[in-house]
């Protein structure tokens, strides 16, 4: 069983923003896996299904970014899932736009959603897929809550597809394989 959480902020006003790239990847995964992420559970929009004999739970926390840990904590405790089977997908301002990075574990890198998750799970020992949103030209809040420029959309759309493929590869072939295939 895998719990896969894409981080973002709920509400129409945040759709398409840099901070919501995790939600975009969950939507892409749902499409690829034939799932609907519409049920409200664990303070999240949830989709449940199966892939290659594994139960898959897709989460889009509805707690707002800085409290993402509440949703993930509830799901992890409900399913009694080992942390190596929890995959978190989120934006990273320190990665170039459109780049993805997969890691087995690590710090929050200053990302408040990840701070919340690490604090509530009491561990940094879970896989994550980071999607580069580029360095801010202006202040950080305006950057992460801003929408992608028209010139950036093709690159970010490709990154979302690549990140979804990377998550599928983690499930099928393990994180080491996915890291060597997708970390460029």
Swiss-Prot record:
Q: Where is this site: Discriminates between blocked and unblocked aminoacyl-tRNA?
A: 9
For this protein, the record's InterPro entries field holds: Pept_tRNA_hydro, Pept_tRNA_hydro_CS, Pept_tRNA_hydro_sf
Q: Which SUPFAM superfamilies does the entry mention?
A: Peptidyl-tRNA hydrolase-like
Chief subcellular site? cytoplasm
Marked site: Stabilizes the basic form of H active site to accept a proton: 91
Q: What keywords are annotated for this sequence in UniProt? A: Cytoplasm, Hydrolase, RNA-binding, tRNA-binding
Q: List the catalysed reactions.
A: an N-acyl-L-alpha-aminoacyl-tRNA + H2O = an N-acyl-L-amino acid + a tRNA + H(+)
Q: Name one GO biological process term.
A: rescue of stalled ribosome
Which top-rank group of organisms is this from? Answer: Bacteria
One GO molecular-function entry:
peptidyl-tRNA hydrolase activity
Q: What is its EC number?
A: 3.1.1.29
* Any one Pfam family match given in the protein's UniProt record, by short name: Pept_tRNA_hydro
Q: Record's Gene Ontology CC terms?
A: cytoplasm
What is the role of this chain? Hydrolyzes ribosome-free peptidyl-tRNAs (with 1 or more amino acids incorporated), which drop off the ribosome during protein synthesis, or as a result of ribosome stalling.
Instruction: Family membership, please give it.
Output: Belongs to the PTH family.
HAMAP family tied to this protein: Pept_tRNA_hydro_bact
Protein known as: Peptidyl-tRNA hydrolase
Tell me which species this is from: Thermoanaerobacter sp. (strain X514)
